Design a protein with these regions (language model features):
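Alpha-helical protein-protein interaction modules
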Residues: 6-15, 23-247
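Aromatic-rich carbohydrate-recognition surfaces in CAZymes
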Residues: 20
């Protein structure tokens, strides 16, 4: 499987396999080996940053993303993911500035509009959040994650009928994509329905989802819930989304 790849690429693929096995210790070891093999490779710092953020080590993750950005300053996805990490760390104003920096490079980069919308949603500037999510949907061709976040913004702004319509549509076309299950949970959190949110998170768990979504501030209202803590325990991430030590 790995014969045609250089050693750094092999380590990255192994780390991704460990992610979907939820083998966090092995994933970290693979990332560190990849960095040792090629410390100037932006992608390995980028991916390692996400591992750190999922582990609740926000300050270290942001530092790795800044390193990745310094190595590849024209990368749209690295720039956008730095904005995402800042939002996860509750550094919303910094996140907004970073998303705007990304959009200066490419005003039509859907992910940057989505990240900007997430920061606005947490700042409770909901009209702006709704506008950014709509733009992300327009540019991406109706991405489920973007639609779920639009529904979340509708729900938290009091436009619950519009949120319910979107979540019903998402449920109707939901298939085997565990990311859609977890995104539907986000909408129910916006609607204040923790029971439905947990039902959909457990569906995502059964489908072996990527749990990085759980670090996002939309899930803050669930962190003290025993059912959510049990989910994290099963994934092996009881400390997921821990507060940034810099705060």
């Amino acid at each position: 499987m790995f014969l045609s790849l250089d050693r750094t690429g092999q380590q990255l693929i192994r780390s991704v396999l460990d992610l979907y096995d939820w083998d966090w210790g092995s994933a970290e070891a693979e990332y560190k080996r990849a960095i040792a093999l090629n410390p100037g490779y932006a992608t390995v710092h980028h991916w390692y940053a996400w591992h750190l953020i999922v582990m609740g080590r926000n300050d270290e993750g942001i530092a790795e993303l800044r390193k990745a950005e310094s190595l590849d300053p024209l990368s749209l996805i690295i720039s956008a993911d730095l904005a995402d990490a800042l939002c996860i760390a509750h550094l919303y104003d910094e996140s907004v500035r970073q998303s705007r920096k990304t959009l200066e490079m490419d005003p039509n980069f859907a992910i940057a509009h989505y990240q900007l919308g997430q920061a606005f949603a947490q700042k409770r500037t909901l009209d702006e959040a709704i506008g950014e999510f709509k733009r992300a949907i327009e540019l991406s061709g109706n991405d489920d994650t973007f639609e779920a976040n639009l529904a979340y913004a509708y729900a938290t702004s009091g436009r619950k009928d519009e949120a319910i319509k979107i979540v019903n549509d998402l449920e109707d076309r939901q298939s085997q994509h565990s990311s859609t299950d977890a995104s539907i949970a986000v909408v129910y959190l916006g609607l204040g329905d923790k029971d439905q949110a947990m039902i959909w998170l457990n569906k995502a768990y059964q489908a072996r989802f990527n749990p990085s979504i759980l670090v996002r501030p939309a899930f803050d209202s669930l962190r003290s819930d025993a059912r959510f803590q049990d989910l994290l325990r099963r994934i092996g991430l009881l400390q997921i989304g821990a507060p940034n030590p810099l705060h």
